[in-house]
Amino acid sequence: MRVLIIDDDTTFCQLLAETLQGKGIEVEWTTDGFGGYEMSLDQPYDLFILDQRMPLVLGSELAEYLREDNPKAKIILTSAFADEALGDIARSIDSPLLSKPFGADRLLELIKRLLSRSRKHSKLAKP
């Protein structure tokens, strides 16, 4: 599995990458939203973890760009400022919202759910 983390907090990216790599997940990260979008065009990722509040682009906006190129992209939105309005935004882009700080177990369980949901949909779509 390949994951791209896009968050303007370098320390958060490094810690999250180390956690996921410790579980055998291939991880790349960037602190630049548009740079992350460019990375997604160059190589495929199974999952994107996006911070909502970044300097040049909101994570929810970035999710829309990513889904234009890959409608089945699996995306987790994160924020230290999660509220009901952001929850509504996350639902509107069909992405779960994780409120920072969150534990590794919670993230790993969410990743498992997203991947199993995607496998179920692909099995249903086959004739």
Protein language model annotation of sequence segments:
Residues 24-31, 39:
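Short hydrophobic/Thr-rich beta-strand motif most characteristic of the beta2 strand and flanking loop
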Residues 51:
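Active-site residues of response regulator receiver
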Residues 14-22:
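Charged docking surfaces used in two-component/phosphorelay signaling
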Residues 31-35, 58-62:
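Acidic catalytic/metal-coordinating carboxylates
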Residues 54:
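Receiver (REC) domain active-site loop signature in two-component systems and cognate sites
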Residues 6-7, 30, 48:
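Conserved sequence signature across two-component system core domains
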Residues 102-112, 119:
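C-terminal output helix
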